[in-house]
Amino acid sequence: MAIFIDITEWNEIRYFNTKGTRNKCVVRNPLNDELYFFKTSIQKDQKDYKTEFWSEIIASEIGNALGFNVLKYDIALHGNEIGCISKSMIGNEETLVEGISLLTGYDNTYTPESKDSYSEYTFQFIKKALNNFDLDSFVDDIIKVIIFDSIISNSDRHQENWAFIAKHME
């Protein structure tokens, strides 16, 4: 069950940059020094989707109830903004490799920002890229993501919102 956390006094890490359409920031819990991601709802074309962040919380609760390996999301207050918060899924020695890096590394002609490439973004394409990098053991995880997205009616699984955790290398 999601809990409410006031993170107003937590330290915002301004040098972290996260992708996506929503306003978000990275904060550090002063009690345990762990990083968390705080997301608010989006405001678009003079429309305010104030309750949009709840979809993250509800998806998290459904995923956990069904036994999927999903992040836990809670409700958070950051100053005068309400949103959702999740603990960082990576440790200090790890980094996220987004799907877009994997796919463009496999096929450098693939241009996800071009509408002409939309039809190329398929399970088969992802599977070929995984096989190319000897990551075929993750095919079952991709299938689980597709099943979970179907259950929660997520139609926004683009290349920048799935990733692999890798050891950080300089």
What are the functions of these language-model segments?
Residues F68-D74, V139-D140, H158-Q159:
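Short secondary-structure capping/junction motifs at helix and strand boundaries
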Residues S153:
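Residues in Ca2+-coordinating acidic/glycine-rich loops
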Residues M1-Y110:
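Conserved ATP-binding subdomain of kinase catalytic cores across diverse folds
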Residues H158-E170:
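Catalytic activation segment of kinase domains across protein kinase-like and atypical kinase folds
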Residues Q43-Q46, Q124, Q159:
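Residue-identity detector for glutamine
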Residues M89-I146:
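ATP-dependent phospho-/nucleotidyl transfer catalytic cores
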